[in-house]
């Protein structure tokens, strides 16, 4: 048997992955007598390429799928990609910009066609990269959030929620990105702590008796002020309530009103109210019937309502100009440094604007109630448990979800307006006739749905809903979702709500929330920071097994993972150690004819010890896999294979392997070596699927096993008859004695070949 001197992962990994695909090992066979184990991949963006976060996330999922597959249950891991509305449209719009064009130059239809062309040509590259990583998804079930089936699901859900009164359209203050020119949900806003200024501005009272001071971090919004509010119990301002002030520059008369929203002890105790550009001010405006004046356009450019001095300026240019003009008019008070959280677009990092706009919303509170109950009861388990409190806090304070986006790539809202009377009709297809006026011409709503609107249906839309399918009956609820805590609101909570609403089932039983991948300094890995390596380059240099093992080994359950080249060396060195042990073992056992039955073995202390340890390792490994403590499983397996099997048992067996005169002892050593090593490969296969498969097939030539592939081989079972604490203690004493002797020899520089007598007292 010819075995390469060094482990070369590239050819081996490709060979065995293609073998698994060819033989359909990743596609489950439904068995009504067995409960399946199902995992849904968090669909990566179609624009995405593999990064270290993907490596951790998908390796965690793959370890569990491979482990469960070996336990004999039907396993399903559904893959797919997300259409990623804003991100994907941005990619294609940048291409247009290189040609000196905008989306408006070519129109909606041509832009969408161009994005589909891009998707077919370059989108989904990450899927091929996940295959290189070794992900054992059922690729026959791959989905796309805008494929025909999922589009049908989206329309059906929108229509049903609208019929239930849970989807509505209305003017509300929303988060607006002037760069992406679209609304954003609250959870799509990244809040960053920044040090800015709190500007105190003096508004003159109309009667000329003085002025009132208001403070703001956004002076440009003063141009849309329609009131100044004070607390009704604030004695300082009671006499001013009902009076008016003149808004500087605009000269608009605005009232001084009383509202309990105002904090008496913050700043001057007077608050400027801008109903069209602040969510809290909007609520105050509703209570006091204030005018809502929009002072900037969708690009963040000041409009005619801002006044001639400021019209045409960007919002930040306007801010500077206002400060300059207030100083000139002696209306600028104290400027105080102020630390506050500033919202940024999660896609382009632009500072978002609070903006009054006509949008579509989902009422979330009615659906949140059951989603709270299933987590409180433990029906859906969030692990680690510390995330339960975070989840419940958000759900118990949930707000309506703005689902409309002012872009062209995505699921277009299935709502139509009669061209004659404006009647709104929500339907899957263009209506034939208006029920109100009989007109036959309609215009579809221009907006598309938030990307997450298709994603929250992922657990059941991927299984064929709204059709009644066997997959839905058999595989839902799924067993495990592995994701990052950053999308616990955006995705996890919404999937629970949607699946309960439309399936009357939970979407998954367990959610494993893992940490971030950080560099050696503790910084989050990011390509923009230049501290994130390309995982494909790592796979090409180290092999997928080494990368997978290193990430699992180094990531405690639910904790952040610290990445460095030295971490990668752990996986590579372990793979090399396994390979060298395999090569040495096979070079020697192939020279020994025959193989005894297990009941014919002449077991010595070392044999009994390694079997005792092996069965304890089987117990602990299975326990850790079941409890999702995958790094503990990796640590246990490396310790056993490297330190106990290679460093001790393999060395102790050499005398018998080389001793052809003791045939019985030689055959026993051969059997135990092959048996323990093939069992170890079974235990390690979920984490390192390729090197274990190669070695397992090599062992199979000398040690018959019934399975055709390690991917579908049986996971080892504990044999308690072999676990023996006395043998473990006896062997520990021998190991300690040998270690002491080796240390003494080294201290006196005694050559290894020199024999000495040992006296033990």
Task: For the regions a language model picked out, list residue spans one by one.
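Acidic, turn-prone loop/beta-hairpin segments
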Residues: 82, 178, 185-190, 432, ...
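N-terminal catalytic cores of NTP/NDP-binding nucleotidyl/phosphoryl-transfer enzymes
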Residues: 31-92, 145, 154, 214-217, ...
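Secondary-structure capping and boundary motifs in well-ordered enzyme cores
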Residues: 31-41, 53-56, 60, 80, ...
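Alpha-helical recognition segments enriched in aromatics with Gly/Pro capping
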Residues: 260, 288-300, 407-410, 414-420, ...
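Structural preference for alpha-helix termini/caps and helix-kink/transition segments
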Residues: 545-589, 667-685, 746-753
């Amino acid at each position: 048997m010819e075995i390469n001197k060094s482990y070369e992962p590239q050819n081996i990994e490709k060979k065995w992955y293609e073998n698994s695909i060819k033989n359909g090992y990743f596609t489950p066979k439904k068995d009504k007598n067995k409960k399946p184990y199902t995992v849904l991949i968090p669909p990566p963006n179609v624009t995405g390429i593999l990064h270290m976060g993907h490596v951790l996330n998908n390796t965690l999922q793959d370890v569990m799928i491979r482990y469960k597959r070996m336990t004999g249950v039907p396993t399903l891991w559904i893959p797919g990609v997300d259409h990623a509305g804003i991100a994907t449209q941005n990619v294609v719009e940048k291409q247009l910009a290189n040609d000196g064009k905008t989306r408006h130059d070519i129109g909606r239809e041509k832009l969408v066609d161009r994005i589909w062309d891009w998707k077919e040509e370059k989108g989904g590259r990450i899927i091929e990269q996940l295959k290189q990583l070794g992900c054992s998804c059922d690729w026959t079930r791959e989905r796309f959030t805008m494929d025909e089936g999922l589009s049908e699901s989206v329309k059906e859900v929108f229509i049903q929620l609208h019929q239930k009164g849970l989807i509505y359209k209305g003017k509300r203050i929303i988060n607006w990105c002037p760069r992406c020119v679209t609304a954003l949900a609250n959870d799509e806003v990244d809040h960053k702590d920044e040090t800015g200024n709190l500007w105190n501005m003096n508004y003159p009272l109309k009667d000329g008796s003085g002025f009132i001071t208001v403070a703001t971090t956004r002076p440009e919004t003063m141009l849309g002020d329609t009131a100044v509010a004070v607390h009704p119990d604030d004695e300082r301002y009671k006499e001013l309530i009902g009076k008016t002030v003149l808004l500087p520059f605009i000269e608009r008369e605005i009232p001084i009103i009383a509202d309990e929203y105002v904090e008496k002890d913050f700043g001057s105790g007077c608050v400027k109210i801008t109903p069209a550009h602040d969510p809290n001010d909007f609520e105050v405006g509703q209570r006091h019937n204030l005018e809502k004046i929009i002072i900037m356009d969708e690009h963040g450019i000041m409009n005619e309502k801002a006044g001639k001095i400021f019209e045409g300026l960007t919002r930040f240019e306007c801010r500077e100009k206002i400060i300059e003009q207030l100083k000139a008019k002696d209306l600028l008070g104290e400027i105080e440094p102020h630390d506050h959280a500033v919202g940024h677009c999660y896609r382009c990092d632009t500072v978002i604007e609070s903006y009054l706009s006509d949008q579509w919303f989902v009422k979330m509170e009615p659906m949140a109630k059951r989603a709270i109950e299933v987590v409180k009861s433990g029906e859906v388990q969030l692990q680690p448990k510390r995330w339960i409190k975070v989840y419940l806090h958000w759900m118990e304070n949930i707000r309506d979800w703005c689902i409309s986006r002012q872009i062209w790539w995505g699921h277009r809202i299935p709502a139509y307006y009669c061209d004659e009377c404006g009647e709104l009709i929500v339907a899957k297809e263009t209506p034939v006739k208006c029920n109100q006026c009989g007109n036959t011409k309609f215009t579809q709503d221009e907006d598309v749905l938030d990307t997450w609107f298709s994603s929250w249906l992922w657990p059941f839309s991927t299984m064929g809903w709204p059709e009644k399918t066997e997959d839905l009956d058999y595989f839902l609820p799924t067993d495990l979702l592995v994701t990052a805590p950053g999308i616990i609101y955006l995705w996890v909570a919404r999937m629970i709500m949607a699946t309960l609403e439309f399936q009357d089932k939970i979407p998954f039983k367990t959610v494993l929330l893992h940490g971030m991948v950080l560099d050696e300094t503790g910084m989050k890995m990011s390509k923009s920071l230049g501290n994130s390596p390309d995982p494909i380059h790592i796979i090409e240099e180290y092999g997928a097994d080494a990368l997978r093992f290193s990430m699992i080994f180094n990531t405690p359950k639910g904790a952040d993972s610290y990445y460095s080249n030295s971490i990668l060396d752990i996986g590579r060195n372990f793979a090399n150690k396994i390979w060298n042990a395999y090569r040495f073992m096979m070079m020697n056992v192939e020279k020994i004819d025959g193989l005894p039955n297990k009941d014919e073995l002449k077991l010595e202390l070392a044999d009994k010890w390694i079997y005792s340890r092996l069965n304890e390792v089987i117990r602990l490994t299975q326990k850790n896999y079941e409890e999702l403590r995958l790094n503990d499983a990796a640590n246990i397996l490396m310790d056993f294979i490297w330190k106990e099997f290679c460093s001790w048992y393999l060395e102790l067996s050499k005398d018998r392997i080389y001793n052809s005169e003791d045939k019985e002892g030689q055959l026993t050593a051969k059997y135990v070596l092959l048996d323990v090593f093939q069992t170890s490969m079974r235990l390690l296969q979920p984490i390192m699927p390729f090197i274990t498969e190669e070695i397992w097939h090599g062992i199979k030539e000398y040690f018959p096993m019934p399975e055709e592939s390690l991917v579908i081989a049986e996971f080892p079972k504990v044999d308690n008859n072999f676990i023996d604490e006395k043998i473990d203690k006896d062997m520990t004493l021998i190991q300690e004695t040998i270690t002491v002797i080796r240390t003494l020899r080294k201290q006196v520089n005694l050559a290894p070949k020199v024999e000495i007598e040992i006296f033990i007292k």
